[in-house]
């Protein structure tokens, strides 16, 4: 009997020892994984770019629309600065009508450019002035020409750039205004690169492009670096979502109509069911 009790006690001690060892091992592994994750998080800002601050854009409100004067100024910045390297393939001249320009203004800008036309009777290619239906042309014929002109870097199309980047307009504004005079100490950049903390990795082929008074706004707005960055960010946000204003207008209309129908349904329900729910029955037992 004593032998059996001693054997049982030894088995219990072994089980407790194994359980304690497993617990210590698990805690140690968890601590090491936590330290490794902290190291990875510390590298995130350098590897993935500094997170841009959240700016109070006027069009971010639930019932707010774009600042169309800012869209017009932003298109001017794009046309005079950004269009030298970046395309806007998804935007046609007609998209500007009623948003930032009149029909005659958009048509005049389109006619300044030449587009490929149908060949003549002899099969030779012809050129024609642009029309409102034409899309805004890019600066390069193809990707190879773009890379050759930019030391191997390929300038992205800006039609959907706001939707394609985490942070949207905040990222675009921060990137355009985030170039320091000198890179931080210890940062080594590849040849032909520039330092920008908001760009993943910090090394970006595009140098600073916005400087005070670089463009002359038609409405007399001071063309500071931050103002130009704000306007072109607003324009690119509109370019990535041209239906933004109409969507909010239709959403407001739908909200009003559905709310009215909901209130009407409550009234109908009460009108139809109140007599039924308040109906009382009287039971008269049969007389014997």
Curated annotation (Swiss-Prot):
Any single GO CC term annotated in Swiss-Prot or TrEMBL for this entry: plasma membrane
Locations listed in the record: Mitochondrion inner membrane
Membrane topology: Multi-pass membrane protein
Region feature (Disordered): 111-138
Entry EC number(s): 7.1.1.8
EC main group: translocase
Stretches assigned to the Cytochrome c domain: 69-222
Disruption phenotype: Leads to lethality, showing that it is an essential gene.
InterPro entries per record: Cyt_c-like_dom (IPR009056), Cyt_c-like_dom_sf (IPR036909), Cyt_c1 (IPR002326), Cyt_c1_TM_anchor_C (IPR021157)
A matching Pfam family: Cytochrom_C1
Entry's Gene Ontology BP terms: mitochondrial electron transport, ubiquinol to cytochrome c
Cofactor comment: Binds 1 heme c group covalently per subunit.
Role according to the record: Component of the ubiquinol-cytochrome c oxidoreductase, a multisubunit transmembrane complex that is part of the mitochondrial electron transport chain which drives oxidative phosphorylation. The complex plays an important role in the uptake of multiple carbon sources present in different host niches.
Subunit structure: Component of the ubiquinol-cytochrome c oxidoreductase (cytochrome b-c1 complex, complex III, CIII), a multisubunit enzyme composed of 10 subunits. The complex is composed of 3 respiratory subunits cytochrome b (COB), cytochrome c1 (CYT1) and Rieske protein (RIP1), 2 core protein subunits COR1 and QCR2, and 5 low-molecular weight protein subunits QCR6, QCR7, QCR8, QCR9 and QCR10.
PANTHER family: CYTOCHROME C1, CYTOCHROME C1, HEME PROTEIN, MITOCHONDRIAL
Protein name: Cytochrome b-c1 complex catalytic subunit, mitochondrial
Organism lineage string: Eukaryota, Fungi, Dikarya, Ascomycota, Saccharomycotina
């Amino acid at each position: 009997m004593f032998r059996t009790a001693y054997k049982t006690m030894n088995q219990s001690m072994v089980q407790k020892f194994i359980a304690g060892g497993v617990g210590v091992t698990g805690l140690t592994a968890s601590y090491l994984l936590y330290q490794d994750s902290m190291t990875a998080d510390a590298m995130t800002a350098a590897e993935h770019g500094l997170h841009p601050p959240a700016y109070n854009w006027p069009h971010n409100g639930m019932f707010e629309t774009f600042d169309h004067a800012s869209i017009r100024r932003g298109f001017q910045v794009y046309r005079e600065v950004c269009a030298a390297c970046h395309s806007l393939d998804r935007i046609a001249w007609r998209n500007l009508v009623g948003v930032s320009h009149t029909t005659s203004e958009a048509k005049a800008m389109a006619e300044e450019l030449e587009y490929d036309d149908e060949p003549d009777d002899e099969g030779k290619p012809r050129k024609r002035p642009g029309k409102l239906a034409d899309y805004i042309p890019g600066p390069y014929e193809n990707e190879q020409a773009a890379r050759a002109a930019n030391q191997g870097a390929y300038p992205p199309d800006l039609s959907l750039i706001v939707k394609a980047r985490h942070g949207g307009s905040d990222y675009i504004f921060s990137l355009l205004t985030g170039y320091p005079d000198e890179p931080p100490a210890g940062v080594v950049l590849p040849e032909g690169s520039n330092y920008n903390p908001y760009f993943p990795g910090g090394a970006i082929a595009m140098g600073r492009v916005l400087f005070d008074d670089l463009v002359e706004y038609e409405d007399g707005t001071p063309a500071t670096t931050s103002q130009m960055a704000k306007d072109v960010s607003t324009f690119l946000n509109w370019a990535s979502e041209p239906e933004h204003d109409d969507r909010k207008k239709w959403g407001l209309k739908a909200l009003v109509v559905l709310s009215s129908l909901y209130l009407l349904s409550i009234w109908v329900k009460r009108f139809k069911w109140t007599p039924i729910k308040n109906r009382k029955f009287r039971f008269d037992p049969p007389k014997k």
